[in-house]
Amino acid sequence: MAVNKKMALELVKMRLNRLPGDTSLDPMLEARIDAAAAELEHSGIILTDSMEDVMLTVDMAVWQYQCRDQQTGMPDWLRARRRERWLRQT
């Protein structure tokens, strides 16, 4: 994973309205970031350290965290971003 994990964690915390000093969920949030990056890479996207890839990974991780107990599919906006990112690469 080429995405800056520390930056991604800080951005995930911001999106979830968590204080930067609160580290109680860091292990789970880091696991979500890793899972989101792995899912993106499994779909054929080669992640870089670009801000676009960091934000895509953050958006995936936040969506997975917020919808972990729901039976809803990926939102259209996120599916389209993932697809557009994949298309630019090929």
Where on the chain are the PLM-derived regions?
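Short alpha-helical linear motifs
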Residues: D53-M55, A80
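Amphipathic alpha-helical interaction segments
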Residues: L40-L47, Q64-T72
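Conserved short "hinge" loops at termini or chain/domain junctions
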Residues: M1-D53, R85-T90
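Protruding loop/beta-arch "assembly-hinge" segments enriched in small, turn-prone residues
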Residues: A2, C67-T90
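Short, hydrophobic/amphipathic alpha-helical patches that form generic packing surfaces
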Residues: M55-C67
